[in-house]
Amino acid sequence: EGQVVLLCGEAGIGKSRLVRHLRDQLMGEHYETLQYQCSPHRTNTVLYPVVTYLRQVAGLADEDSASMQQQKLATLMADNGFDDRITIALFADLLSIQGHDQDQLANVSPDKCKDMTLEALVQYLHRLADRSPALLIVEDAHWLDPTTLDLMTRVIDRIRQMRLLVLITFRPDFRPVWAEYSHVTFLTLNRLPRRQSAELIATMTGGKVLPQEVQQAILAKTDGVPLYIEELMESLLETGLLAEGIDSFALKAPLKDMVIPDSLQALLMERVDRLGPVKEIAQIGAAIGREFTYELLRATVEITDSQLN
């Protein structure tokens, strides 16, 4: 029967890395994967992560003609056993595909249309899981729009009848209503203790010893946040503030001259600032989203292929 795992942790604590590790562990297994990626810029966009997933799995592109989009939708529906005109019209409306039996919904109220759409999406997951076990990953659920939150509640309420594992990641300020369900497991990722933080630093330096004062400054500033430790170490190694020896590093200047950003966000911005001409590309990529194709980036930036490569 289906299960749900809720994975809670602050930014940079390792939620996404744990998700990647799970997928690596399942490599070679026969299962379907779905990913709903939430966005801080789309918290009020109805079903944004679901629409993004469906457009990707259907292969829809902005430059597709209306007939091409209709054809791709028909293939997606047929692959998942949907042949009734109303359900196909619901998906067409959700994906903003024009001219595909829209008259089927002409007399349906907005509230009824929303309810029917959510039920169709639950059935989509059910049929997918009927073919093979499925993994649904919902990343950054603290940015879920209300309608997708409603959808997830419906899925979790019925998941015991599906061969489906739902993994939901979120930050501590999100309070999932499903935490007390018997088929839901709640996990919290905490900050690393100093010993494990030191082990992570040693991994980053290839086992070479840092000056004690530098190591203590890193441990104090990062306070056990793994991504902060990794990014700060990368920054120190990139900027040449440390001289590398055979089995250790040495400071090139007094520690007081080293400026260590006060937060992970400030550190990341500092590293972006050092990218030079690549900075604008990185910023455009960040504005697009966590994942994007080369073609989309190429169409967005005003440089040549050779420069982008």
List the predicted regions and their residue ranges.
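Short hydrophobic/aromatic beta-strand immediately N-terminal to the Walker A/P-loop
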Residues: 4-8, 35, 135-137
